[in-house]
């Protein structure tokens, strides 16, 4: 029996704040249009997804406000850290995202950035913002589940 090829998925950056501030309705994988120094910085894990979001403009999905720090060994041709980056999605996927975000309070946020077979990918999620009481409620549920797991483990 042939061996399965080893998966190359390697998480480089995660947006943990997004899972706290939003309830994720659906997720989708997208490629990105990058320059040479940007991919080198991504491989060095010099990425911040915290304030990022995706905007649909003129039939294109654009990743905005994501910081990819300058490449340390770069020269005068280094990239702008806050440059807007085009996401590579099929037309149907873009139309689906555009339709979902027409509702009030729905946005698209980057959840995770990783390498897949040498290409940088970003996992984006269609999300609905949580209220403060929803955040507290989800924290309580998580604590209760942790207590239950502890009690079952110590049995």
From Swiss-Prot:
This is SsrA-binding protein. Required for rescue of stalled ribosomes mediated by trans-translation. Binds to transfer-messenger RNA (tmRNA), required for stable association of tmRNA with ribosomes. tmRNA and SmpB together mimic tRNA shape, replacing the anticodon stem-loop with SmpB. tmRNA is encoded by the ssrA gene; the 2 termini fold to resemble tRNA(Ala) and it encodes a 'tag peptide', a short internal open reading frame. During trans-translation Ala-aminoacylated tmRNA acts like a tRNA, entering the A-site of stalled ribosomes, displacing the stalled mRNA. Coiled coil: none annotated. The lineage of its organism: Bacteria, Bacillati, Bacillota, Bacilli, Lactobacillales. It is found in: Cytoplasm. Disulfide bonds: none annotated. The keyword Nucleotide-binding does not apply. It comes from Pediococcus pentosaceus (strain ATCC 25745 / CCUG 21536 / LMG 10740 / 183-1w). Gene3D superfamilies: 2.40.280.10. PANTHER family: SSRA-BINDING PROTEIN, TMRNA-BINDING COMPONENT OF TRANS-TRANSLATION TAGGING COMPLEX.
């Amino acid at each position: 029996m042939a061996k399965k090829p080893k998966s190359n998925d390697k998480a480089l950056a995660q947006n943990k704040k997004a899972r706290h501030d939003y309830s994720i309705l659906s997720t989708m994988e997208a490629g990105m249009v990058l320059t040479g120094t940007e991919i080198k910085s991504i491989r060095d894990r010099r990425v911040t997804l915290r304030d990022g979001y995706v905007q649909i403009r003129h039939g294109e999905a654009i990743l905005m406000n994501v910081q990819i720090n300058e490449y340390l060994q770069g020269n005068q041709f280094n990239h702008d850290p806050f440059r807007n980056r085009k996401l590579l999605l099929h037309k149907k996927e873009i139309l689906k995202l555009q339709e979902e975000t027409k509702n009030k309070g729905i946005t698209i946020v980057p959840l995770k950035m990783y390498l897949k077979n040498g290409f940088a990918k970003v996992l984006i999620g269609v999300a609905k913002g949580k209220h403060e009481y929803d955040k507290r409620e989800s924290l309580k549920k998580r604590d209760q589940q942790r207590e239950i797991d502890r009690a079952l483990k110590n049995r």
